Design a protein with these regions (language model features):
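A short helix->loop->beta-strand "cap" motif at the edges of active sites that frequently abuts
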Residues: 68-70, 150-154
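Glycine-rich oxoanion-binding loops at beta->alpha junctions
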Residues: 87-120, 132
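Glycine/threonine-rich flexible loop motifs
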Residues: 129-141
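C-terminal and late-domain segments of enzyme folds
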Residues: 26-31, 39, 47-49, 55-57, ...
Length: 344
């Protein structure tokens, strides 16, 4: 991963950012300068609500407007085409008439079949990722690439920023003995690549079966050292429980609480920022955590009640119970290490 970061696919400027920078995502570069990639193509689009252009128009609408382009099918990842579903929820789009055929790749079907790709000669992948290994959108990417290789379909990845920067790495590399859909590649927890760079690495390192014909539409104006809010791009929460960039920064480490008996804050308006349980002493916990002097972060004692929130968490841990714990407050995101903090 570090070698790929140094490959200068995107530059690492390391200069002070005085104002927000204009960045064009892959979808905008495609539509403005690379239309020859999709002309006369029959397309399968892998996307969700985050697949928008610079004017917030969904990519599927833009593609349907292009002459001599036929959008045959849309594949949606976890959380659905419109980001309407909480983690793990299965989705059915059979009743939507105004769109091309929409097929969920989460649930019983996670790889496009030969029937699903019938008459398709190009797969476009365009989803905003978060930069954490256990975000399942990147697992969907690999499985789509496997199907593309098996059925001889080209893959075009429209690149988007890594919102938590492209020059930082945190956490251990996954041991493939524990490979699941939630951890699919031997990469660090926070891997510091864009989705396009990761696609190239997946192919180059042979982490999937086959070797699909792969091409990346690079962004324009993005550099590795940029946080998402240092661009002029609007924030669209990539999944229901990542409402803002600060949550995305905290997520790689604090998501590990999901596997414990501690609430990770689902069922509140601050998932992953709040954590606790009914039996915790919030004062003592916050004191102990602050005494660790972890860089770039402080902990505030809090009380909260996880409750069902439609589209975010229907059945949160400790539902309707009073929980005591801490709120994590990042004071210096350049020094903050989410994974180290989560493990502490």
């Amino acid at each position: 991963v570090y070698k790929r970061q140094q490959s200068l696919y995107y530059k690492n400027e390391l200069k002070p950012i005085k104002e927000k920078l204009t960045v064009l995502n892959g979808i905008d570069v495609l539509l403005e300068k690379k239309l020859h990639f999709i002309k006369s193509r029959k397309i399968a689009l892998v996307t969700n609500h985050s697949g928008i252009d610079k004017n917030l128009i969904p990519n599927y609408k833009r593609l349907m407007e292009v002459e001599d382009v036929e959008l045959k099918v849309i594949f949606s990842p976890e959380h659905g085409l419109f980001g309407e579903s909480e983690a793990g929820e299965k989705i059915n789009y059979s009743d939507i008439d105004e769109l091309p055929r929409v097929i969920s790749l989460y649930g019983g079907t996670r790889k496009p079949s030969a029937e699903m790709l019938k008459d398709v000669n190009l797969i476009i992948y365009d989803i905003q990722d978060i930069g954490a290994r256990f975000y399942t959108y990147i697992s969907t990417l690999g499985m789509v690439m496997e199907s593309a290789s098996e059925y001889g379909v080209k893959v075009l990845v429209l690149d988007r920023p890594n919102p938590i920067k492209g020059n930082m790495i945190e956490g251990p590399i996954l041991d493939l003995k524990f490979q699941t859909f939630v951890g699919y590649y031997p990469i660090p927890t926070r891997y510091g690549l864009t989705i396009g760079e990761l696609a190239l690495m997946i192919n180059g390192e042979k982490w999937i079966d086959g070797n699909p014909d792969l091409e990346i539409v690079k962004m324009k104006g993005w550099t590795r050292d940029l946080w998402y809010d240092q661009t002029k791009l609007p924030w669209v929460k990539p999944s229901p429980n990542i409402p803002d960039l600060n949550t995305a920064i905290i997520y790689p480490g604090m998501c590990m609480l999901e596997a414990t008996n501690i609430s990770e804050g689902r069922g509140t308006k601050k998932p992953f920022k709040k954590f606790g349980a009914p039996w915790i002493n919030k004062i003592e916990l916050s004191k102990e955590l602050n005494n660790l002097n972890l860089p770039g972060v402080v902990f505030k004692p809090i009380t909260f009640i996880p409750t069902p929130i439609k589209g975010m968490s229907n059945n949160p841990k400790y539902k309707n119970q009073v929980c005591h714990g801490s709120e994590i407050i990042v004071t210096n995101r350049e020094k903050f290490n989410s994974v180290r903090t989560g493990m502490k």
